[in-house]
């Protein structure tokens, strides 16, 4: 049993390969995020008709909602090549300059975790995004001089789980800013059925819905759970994922009916039992359960807020009456 099947923050090479094999090739195949898709369809068609590069796009939202996939789809819809990198991978101005000067007209540059770019790197991006040019310094000391290089028109797509950490000047240079929302149970059921078809896994509608119900609104988690439930179907069942088998498998994996895993439950139990339900600061919670603050902010908190189990206040986090009821703990309202 892997208690991180839900709350794992890392995506290993095997899972990246798995996700790549499942990715849709165009917007019509992309399930969910209808408002974002509808707007992008218009923007892409307009840019194509004008024979221009699409405006720079910022995609933000919790992990696993399809930001990277959507970037790939945008590039495919534009008929463009995509080059991918991440904020932590661009350590020096020269790293970014090398990437920018390798772009061809109409290319898409995708930067994941764009909030982790240093300010020095951001400043190089400003003229590149705004004027399609790159200012580089040649030489050192008194003989140093600045040279401006022209860049081909390109589209930068940035993805982040923490849009609030982006500097205002960088954020303002994106023409399209879209927030990816948690998926509905119906959308996730459709995703599970699509994935099972690609994996050649037999599954009935109720089995797919049970997996979707416990996937906390996140396609990556839905696909991850399907892989594990498929194992149980092959070893302990007849190869078909049914509702009964899905419930049994997910219970053994310690994923409860609302999609909470052991880390989520530990967090809520700590707030309720150690801090009388809160308010309690996030740093204190992190220290109490042995997790990084950033992990809680990215992996646990968004979903717990979404389903009403947690409240964020100026004084700290509070476990709600709904959370008490879910955990079977008596709730006493303060007078």
Curated annotation (Swiss-Prot):
Which InterPro entries does the record cross-reference, listed alphabetically? AAA+_ATPase, AAA_lid_4, DNA_helicase_Holl-junc_RuvB, P-loop_NTPase, RuvB-like_N, RuvB_C, WH-like_DNA-bd_sf, WH_DNA-bd_sf
Primary localization:
cytoplasm
Where do the annotations place Mg(2+) binding?
A: 68
Entry EC number(s): 3.6.4.-
Residue ranges annotated as transmembrane are none
Q: Name one GO molecular function term.
A: ATP hydrolysis activity
The residues listed in the UniProt record as binding DNA, with positions renumbered to this chain, are: 293, 312, 317
Where is ATP bound in this sequence?
22-23, 64, 67-69, 130-132, 173, 183, 220
Query: Quick one: a GO biological-process term for this protein?
Result: DNA recombination
What are the boundaries of the region Large ATPase domain (RuvB-L)?
1-183
Q: Which residue ranges does the record annotate as region Head domain (RuvB-H)?
A: 257-335
* Record keywords, A-Z: ATP-binding, Cytoplasm, DNA damage, DNA recombination, DNA repair, DNA-binding, Hydrolase, Nucleotide-binding
Catalytic reaction equation(s) = ATP + H2O = ADP + phosphate + H(+)
Region Small ATPAse domain (RuvB-S): start-end pairs: 184-254
The Gene Ontology CC terms held by the record are:
cytoplasm; Holliday junction resolvase complex
Where does it localize? Answer: Cytoplasm
Family listed? Belongs to the RuvB family.
Domain observations = Has 3 domains, the large (RuvB-L) and small ATPase (RuvB-S) domains and the C-terminal head (RuvB-H) domain. The head domain binds DNA, while the ATPase domains jointly bind ATP, ADP or are empty depending on the state of the subunit in the translocation cycle. During a single DNA translocation step the structure of each domain remains the same, but their relative positions change.
Q: What does this protein do?
A: The RuvA-RuvB-RuvC complex processes Holliday junction (HJ) DNA during genetic recombination and DNA repair, while the RuvA-RuvB complex plays an important role in the rescue of blocked DNA replication forks via replication fork reversal (RFR). RuvA specifically binds to HJ cruciform DNA, conferring on it an open structure. The RuvB hexamer acts as an ATP-dependent pump, pulling dsDNA into and through the RuvAB complex. RuvB forms 2 homohexamers on either side of HJ DNA bound by 1 or 2 RuvA tetramers; 4 subunits per hexamer contact DNA at a time.
Q: Whom does it interact with, and what assembly results? A: Homohexamer. Forms an RuvA(8)-RuvB(12)-Holliday junction (HJ) complex. HJ DNA is sandwiched between 2 RuvA tetramers; dsDNA enters through RuvA and exits via RuvB. An RuvB hexamer assembles on each DNA strand where it exits the tetramer. Each RuvB hexamer is contacted by two RuvA subunits (via domain III) on 2 adjacent RuvB subunits; this complex drives branch migration. In the full resolvosome a probable DNA-RuvA(4)-RuvB(12)-RuvC(2) complex forms which resolves the HJ.
UniProt protein name: Holliday junction branch migration complex subunit RuvB
Q: Which organism is it from?
A: Listeria monocytogenes serotype 4b (strain CLIP80459)
């Amino acid at each position: 049993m892997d208690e991180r099947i839900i709350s794992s923050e890392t995506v290993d090479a095997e899972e990246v390969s798995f996700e790549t094999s499942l990715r849709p090739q165009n917007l019509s195949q992309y399930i969910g995020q209808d408002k974002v898709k509808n707007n992008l369809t218009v923007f892409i068609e307009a840019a194509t008709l004008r024979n221009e590069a699409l405006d720079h796009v910022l995609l933000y939202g919790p992990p696993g909602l399809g930001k990277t996939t959507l970037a790939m789809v945008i590039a495919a819809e534009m008929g463009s090549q995509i080059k991918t990198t991440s904020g932590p991978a661009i350590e020096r101005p020269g790293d970014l300059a090398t990437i920018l000067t390798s772009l061809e007209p109409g290319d898409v540059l995708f930067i994941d975790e764009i909030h982790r770019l240093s300010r020095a790197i951001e400043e190089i991006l400003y003229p590149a995004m705004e004027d399609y040019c790159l200012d580089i310094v040649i030489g050192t000391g008194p003989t140093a001089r600045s040279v401006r290089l022209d860049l081909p028109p390109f589209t930068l797509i940035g993805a982040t789980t923490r849009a609030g950490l982006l500097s205002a000047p960088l954020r303002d240079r994106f023409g399209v800013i879209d927030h990816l929302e948690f998926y509905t149970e119906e959308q996730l059921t459709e995703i599970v059925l699509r994935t099972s078809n690609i994996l050649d896994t037999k599954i009935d509608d109720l089995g797919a819905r049970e997996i979707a119900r416990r996937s906390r609104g996140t396609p990556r988690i839905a696909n991850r759970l399907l892989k594990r439930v498929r194992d149980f179907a092959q070893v302990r069942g007849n190869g078909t994922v049914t509702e009964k088998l899905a419930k049994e498998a997910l219970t053994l994996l310690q994923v409860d009916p609302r999609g909470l895993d052991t880390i989520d439950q530990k967090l809520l139990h700590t707030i309720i039992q150690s801090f009388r339900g809160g308010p309690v600061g996030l740093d204190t919670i992190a220290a109490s359960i042995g997790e990084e603050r950033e992990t809680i902010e990215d992996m646990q908190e968004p979903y717990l807020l979404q389903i009403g189990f947690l409240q964020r206040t100026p004084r700290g986090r509070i476990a709600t009456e709904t959370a008490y009821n879910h955990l079977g703990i008596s709730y006493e309202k303060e007078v």
